């Protein structure tokens, strides 16, 4: 296999075959595998070496592809999940994963398989503790790890559990996951795994401040200086309502902020073009003038009225009120022999899925197609329609495989931004 790009040639073995790439030696190996070689079985979650989804084997050792520079591959023997199955037949390790249902959402599965394989290569009959240690660098949000550990132990012959026989049909019968095999082969398609070959890329510019006003200069000069940069989208480019939200009557989250940001990371502009060009333009190049304001850092300060409202449409910073009452609670309380009062609060809980929020959009005539990682395609359709100012039946949402969601992908993230870009640029 040989890929010609722009820099010096890097030669190595990939899944048993000679491979030669002409990449920048500091390019992430995860990008080389996914973008240049088309091996999207290696997943990218955190891009920082925390989640382990991108685990591959380099000379038999576990390595995070997102932290490994392409230049480090020179002369190495590299293995990815695509190399486990032979002639389309699952390896014993993959078969054990399938039998135990160890691949659930599937986003961590390639990393888990490679981590397990690295152990089995040197320790064919490991102990449970050794299996757990070998898998320790790969996070899983779905399984609780038990099925994964059991699958590795069975593949090694160390331990085997008696499982009910698979059945073709019948309520209550055990059957294997219908989408288990693609997840084990690394062929399941998630939001970041595919896009048309001629797609443009988007990079969103986000606020570095939790609260601020800002002025975004005219982008014409930046576009002139960067030929591969097609467009810089701002709030003025939103054809419909520049707001969305999960409440039907409240659409207060701007697609792109107008002149004020209300949280760190709020989108203020979107750069559209080829990948190299949009990555070359830094946030500082845009010349955004920021005026930081006092941030609301707790609900107490938000309700005290000493800081201006986050949204002018929400008086006293209250989004919604809840009320629940049934029966004569007061008299029952007074008649109770034992009374207790207290105040309780819970911490913020992150859904913690590893799958990235990603997708692509294409305008076809007067309709928009949006391929995206989502749990709620119909909610996405309605949100995108009102952002574009078109009818819902002009929007088609094509859900990708979802690498974890747990309710965290009920609301929109990249959907409005992709939709506006595709609709404007056609």
Residues of each region from the PLM?
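Conserved beta-alpha junction segments in alpha/beta enzyme cores
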Residues: 328-388
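Short glycine-rich loop/turn motifs
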Residues: 51-52, 200, 258, 355-360
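Short, surface-exposed loop/turn segments at secondary-structure boundaries that line and modulate
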Residues: 98, 138-141, 147, 233-266, ...
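Gly/Pro-rich active-site capping loops and adjacent beta-alpha segments
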Residues: 65, 70-106, 278-301, 321-322, ...
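Signature of N-terminal electron-transfer/Fe-S-associated modules in redox systems
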Residues: 1-166, 185
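Beta-strand segments within the central parallel beta-sheet cores of soluble alpha/beta enzyme folds
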Residues: 45-48, 129-136, 235, 394-400, ...
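Flexible, low-hydrophobicity surface segments
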Residues: 156-319, 414, 424
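Buried hydrophobic positions in well-ordered alpha/beta secondary-structure cores of metabolic enzymes
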Residues: 29, 78, 108, 142, ...
């Amino acid at each position: 296999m040989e890929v010609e790009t722009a820099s010096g040639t890097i030669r190595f073995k990939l899944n048993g075959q000679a491979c030669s790439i002409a990449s920048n030696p500091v390019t992430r190996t995860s990008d080389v595998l996914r973008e240049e070689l088309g091996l999207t079985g290696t997943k990218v979650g955190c891009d920082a070496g925390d989640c382990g989804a991108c685990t591959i084997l380099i000379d038999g050792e576990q390595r995070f592809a997102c932290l490994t520079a392409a230049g480090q591959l020179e002369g190495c023997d590299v293995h990815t999940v695509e190399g486990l199955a032979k002639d389309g037949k699952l390896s014993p390790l993959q078969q054990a994963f399938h039998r135990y249902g160890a691949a659930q959402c599937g986003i961590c599965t390639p990393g888990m398989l490679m981590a397990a394989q690295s152990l089995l290569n040197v320790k064919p009959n490991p102990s449970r503790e050794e299996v757990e240690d070998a898998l320790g660098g790969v996070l899983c949000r779905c399984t609780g790890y038990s099925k994964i550990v059991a699958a590795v132990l069975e593949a090694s012959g160390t331990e085997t559990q008696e499982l009910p026989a698979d059945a073709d049909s019948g309520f209550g019968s055990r059957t294997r996951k219908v989408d288990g095999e693609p997840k084990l082969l690394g062929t399941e398609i998630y939001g970041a795994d595919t896009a048309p070959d001629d797609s443009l890329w988007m990079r969103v510019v986000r606020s570095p401040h939790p609260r601020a006003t800002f002025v975004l200069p005219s982008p014409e000069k930046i576009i002139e200086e960067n030929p591969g940069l097609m467009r810089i989208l701002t709030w003025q480019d939103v054809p419909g309502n520049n707001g969305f939200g999960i409440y039907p009557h409240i659409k207060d989250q701007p697609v792109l902020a107008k002149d004020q940001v209300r949280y760190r990371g709020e989108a203020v502009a979107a750069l559209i073009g080829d990948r190299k060009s949009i990555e070359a333009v830094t946030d500082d190049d845009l010349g955004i003038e920021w005026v930081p304001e006092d941030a609301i850092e707790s609900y107490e300060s938000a309700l005290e009225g000493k800081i201006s409202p986050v949204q002018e449409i929400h008086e006293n910073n209250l989004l919604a009120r809840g009320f629940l009452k049934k029966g004569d609670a007061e008299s029952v309380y007074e008649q109770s022999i034992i009374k207790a009062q207290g105040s309780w609060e819970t911490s913020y809980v992150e859904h913690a899925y590893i799958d990235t929020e990603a997708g692509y959009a294409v305008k076809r005539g007067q309709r928009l197609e949006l391929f995206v990682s989502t749990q709620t395609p119909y909610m996405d359709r309605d949100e995108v329609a009102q952002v574009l100012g078109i009818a819902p039946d002009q929007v088609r949402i094509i859900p990708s495989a979802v690498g974890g969601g747990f309710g965290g992908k009920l609301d929109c993230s990249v959907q409005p931004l992709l939709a506006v870009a595709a609709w404007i640029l056609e």
